[in-house]
């Protein structure tokens, strides 16, 4: 049984990943929680997100900004850090990130969205 601080919901949302060099990638969101989001990407995009082309664990800090339009009233814009990385196939990778520095109002809106399963 998975024990989590916050529920995780499956989503079908675009996640805009904004890198420090100005590149923006729109990737399909897989799931969302109070704490973070996960998405999949191909090998080429992975090479852009990870400076060394791979992620070796939490000590390997990889941060970027996210923008996720959750609905017409709420777009989540925040900094994030990679917390999970999984190779799914030769050209597909799963990346999990944790949100950083959410203010109280944004955190409240996110909790409301997740608890309402995005409705």
Task: Show the residue positions of the predicted features.
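Structured alpha-helical
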Residues: 1-119
